[in-house]
Regions:
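Extracellular beta-strand-rich solenoid/capping regions of secreted or surface-exposed proteins
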Residues: 58-59, 70-83, 91-134, 148-155
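C-terminal segment of classical bacterial N-terminal signal peptides
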Residues: 13-22
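Boundary at the C-terminal end of the N-terminal hydrophobic targeting segment
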Residues: 23-27
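Acidic Gly/Asp/Thr-rich repetitive segments characteristic of extracellular carbohydrate-active
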Residues: 33-72
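Extracellular beta-strand/beta-solenoid scaffold signature
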Residues: 93-102, 120-129, 144-154, 169-185, ...
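Bacterial N-terminal signal peptides that target proteins for export
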Residues: 1-10
């Protein structure tokens, strides 16, 4: 025997089912100076630290800082965006000897509007060792770390974008990029970056003993670094190329330095008041498009001049 069930009953049952469904999905969560890590990380009840918020958000979700404060170091093990609201300074101070941000995940990681302060005791500002990752670092300030400001050492393929970012006053390099495994590729762009006063290293250092790296640097400035403004080094053949346009190196030991089997190309770039403006070492390749400016005209090695087009 069939019993007819009124549609209003079915609708009520369906509504109740939805109402009792688990509400665990968190595509966007929040932190604030007045937050508490026992909160659910909503806008009305934000968390206190970035780490708790990252733990709470879904993979691929977003963590937003509502107001200016220090929100603690982060270990990132999922795809995530970490950003600050407009006008907010979202600070991260690591524990002594630790990193401000450690990235060890596949997928996309996007960091925007963060201020990483090492206080001359933190190790790296941003440390990445993961594989098959896309990383974006935008409008960030990274300073006073004992080692590198940004250390990208992927164990697989990596696509990177570093935009409008400052890496300064660190103990070693401002930005270092080093693929770790044979057959892997690191590709990306550094645009409007400032790397300066890095004490014992280089503003931007791209190096490899195994994988390939193809990096474009545009509209950037590297100055007052202890060793080199922008440097490349490879021991594995022609798989490392850094292309520069509208980029300035100044007041470094060497402005542009290519070593090993690496290659550099220059267009509409400037080297001024470096100990040596351009140094192309044995086996390295330097290509100039003829529209660059060397203030002191000091060039070591051979530059290949290409026709402008």
């Amino acid at each position: 025997m069939r019993i007819a069930v009124p549609m209003t009953v079915l609708a009520t049952a369906f509504t109740c089912t939805l109402a009792t469904a688990p509400a665990h999905a968190r595509g966007r969560v929040f932190v604030a100076s007045y937050g508490n890590d026992s909160n659910p990380c909503t806008f009305g009840s934000p968390c206190k630290t970035f780490q708790n918020a990252v733990n709470a958000v879904d993979a691929g979700g977003e963590v937003t800082a509502i107001d200016s404060a220090g929100f603690g170091p982060i270990n990132i093990t999922k795809a995530v965006t970490i950003t600050s609201s407009d006008g907010v300074e979202a600070g991260i101070v690591p524990t002594p000897g630790g990193n401000a941000i450690t990235i060890n995940t596949t997928g996309d990681v996007f960091l925007r509007g963060l201020t990483l302060e090492g206080e001359n005791s933190g190790y790296d500002g941003i440390s990445l060792t993961s594989a098959d990752t896309v990383v974006g670092i935008v409008h960030c300030v990274i300073r006073h770390f004992t080692h590198d400001g940004i250390a990208l050492l992927p164990n697989g393929n990596l696509t990177l974008s570093i935009l409008n970012t400052i890496a300064s006053n660190n103990g070693n390099d401002g930005i270092t990029i080093t693929p770790q495994l044979p057959g892997t590729n690191v590709t990306g762009v550094i645009d409007h970056a400032t790397t300066s006063h890095n004490a014992n290293g280089t503003g931007i250092y791209v190096t490899s003993a195994s994988g390939n790296a193809f990096i474009t640097i545009i509209n950037s400035v590297s100055s007052n670094n202890f060793n080199y403004g922008i440097s490349t080094y490879s021991t594995v053949g022609p798989g490392l190329l850094v292309t520069m346009r509208d980029t300035v190196t100044a007041h470094n030991k060497v402005g542009f330095f290519a070593d090993g089997n690496s290659a550099m190309t220059f267009a509409h770039s400037t080297a001024i008041d470096n100990g040596n403006d351009v140094y192309i070492n044995t086996n390295a390749t330097g290509v100039s498009y003829g529209d660059n400016h060397l203030a002191t005209k000091v060039v070591s090695g051979t530059l290949i001049h290409q026709t402008l087009f």
